[in-house]
């Protein structure tokens, strides 16, 4: 029996394989080749190849899981008799999927950790939860099918799955924009002094956050409900700019009235949210500047004027909104160009898809870098991994 070896990059997060066995005619073996790398061997069989590995639950990291998913996708490609078009490790789509899922799932784990520990969440955390879920939805619905295309799986035959993924991508993208806008507007309300015209709204704003998040999801689910109606579950790499957002589904919008109404609603929402975010960011900077001028005579000799929790939270929101504005401005310009010129090349379509997924990929790391509590949780996880790595080397 011949075997094909697929090396896995477990150098940073080595795992201890506790068991591996055969399932009937599908031989699967796993072994540790050295202290820094684990390799999996798939039996050369016909049909679908199955990966079965048992790993201690307490020692399984996110990165290890993603590596196993990559191997499983690679085995699916081998079952179809196709090969990837380029090395997987150099593919920007796969890199974006790994980094984006790792960041967003880590942030979701952080919020779940606080919830089950009984900590009272901050008002902004409620918005960030929905933002993280929406970003994860964008990455899972758009980038993973494109990663499957990189592996050679170019036929998306599930009609319902095509509709669902296309619909989920549009809803996730809209909620991501709306949540970022809501976050910036809420922040500008909370940092204004109590004696300003925002005083009454400042008291009531936290009570409306939950309702605002629900309305945001409901609005985008209703607006995008017309989108799957015109979707066909066929893979099309040709003339993608006329058919839709995703390479694995085509969406010919033959009804010009429906197309115009949908385009008007989505464009109005995006422009409105972007305008509100720019206004909120400018207002935050102006309020901070005035506050700095007022207290400058009090803390003239302070060497760390930006080290307070309030300033760190505001800087985190500003960094997030700036990242959003940059990514979506570039993607908007790219998609306008694609809409105006029908003969756009395929690489430009891929570039536009890469840009639109930049914000869901980067945003969790922006939040974790600016918030010391999130960074502290990540450092605890890193210390546990280093302790396990030390024990692993003694084996």
Curated annotation (Swiss-Prot):
Other known facts: The chimpanzee, gorilla and orangutan orthologous proteins do not exist, their genes are pseudogenes.
The gene coding this protein: VN1R2
Annotated source species: Homo sapiens (Human)
GO BP terms, alphabetized: response to pheromone; sensory perception of chemical stimulus
Keywords from the UniProt entry: Cell membrane, G-protein coupled receptor, Glycoprotein, Membrane, Pheromone response, Receptor, Transducer, Transmembrane, Transmembrane helix
Membrane-crossing segments per the record: 12-32, 52-72, 94-114, 171-191, 209-229, 268-288, 317-337, 347-367
Role according to the record: Putative pheromone receptor.
Main subcellular location: membrane
Ranges in a coiled coil: none
Family: Belongs to the G-protein coupled receptor 1 family.
Any one cellular-component term (Gene Ontology): plasma membrane
Subcellular localization, as worded in the UniProt entry: Cell membrane
Membrane topology annotation: Multi-pass membrane protein
Cytoplasmic face residues: 73-93, 192-208, 289-316, 368-395
Designated name of the protein: Vomeronasal type-1 receptor 2
Gene Ontology molecular function terms on file: pheromone receptor activity
């Amino acid at each position: 029996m011949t075997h094909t070896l697929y090396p896995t990059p477990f150098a940073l997060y080595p795992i201890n394989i506790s068991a591996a066995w055969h399932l009937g005619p599908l031989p699967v073996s796993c072994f540790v080749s050295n202290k820094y790398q684990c390799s999996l061997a798939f039996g050369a069989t016909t049909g679908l190849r199955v990966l079965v590995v048992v790993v201690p639950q307490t020692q399984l990291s996110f990165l290890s899981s993603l590596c196993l998913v990559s191997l499983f996708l690679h085995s699916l490609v081998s079952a179809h008799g196709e090969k990837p078009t380029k090395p997987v490790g150099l593919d920007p789509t796969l890199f974006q999927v790994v980094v984006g899922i790792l960041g967003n799932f880590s942030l979701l784990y952080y919020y779940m950790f606080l919830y089950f520990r009984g900590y009272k969440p901050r008002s902004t955390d409620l918005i960030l939860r929905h933002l993280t879920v929406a970003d994860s939805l964008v990455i899972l619905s758009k980038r993973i099918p494109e990663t499957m295309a990189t592996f050679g799986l170019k036929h998306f035959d599930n009609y319902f799955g095509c509709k669902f993924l296309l619909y989920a991508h549009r809803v996730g993208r809209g909620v991501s924009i709306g949540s970022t806008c809501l976050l910036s507007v809420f922040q500008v309300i909370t940092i204004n002094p109590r004696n300003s015209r925002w005083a009454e709204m400042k008291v009531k704003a936290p009570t409306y956050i939950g309702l605002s998040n629900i309305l945001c999801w409901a609005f985008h689910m209703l607006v995008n409900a017309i989108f799957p109606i015109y979707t066909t579950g066929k893979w099309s790499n040709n003339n993608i700019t006329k058919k839709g957002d995703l390479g694995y589904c085509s969406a010919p919008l033959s009804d010009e009235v429906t197309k115009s109404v949908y385009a008007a609603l989505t464009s109005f929402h995006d422009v409105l949210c972007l305008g509100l975010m720019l206004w909120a960011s400018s207002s935050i900077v102006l309020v901070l500047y005035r506050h700095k001028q007022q207290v400058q005579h009090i803390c003239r000799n302070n060497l760390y004027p930006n080290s307070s929790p309030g300033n760190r939270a505001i800087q985190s929101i500003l960094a997030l909104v700036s990242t959003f504005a940059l990514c979506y401005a570039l993607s908007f310009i790219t998609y306008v160009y694609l809409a105006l010129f029908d003969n756009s090349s395929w690489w430009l379509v891929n570039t536009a898809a890469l840009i639109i997924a930049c914000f869901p990929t980067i945003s969790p790391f922006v939040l974790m870098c600016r918030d010391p509590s999130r960074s502290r949780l990540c450092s605890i996880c890193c210390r546990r991994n280093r302790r396990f790595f030390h024990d692993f080397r003694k084996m």
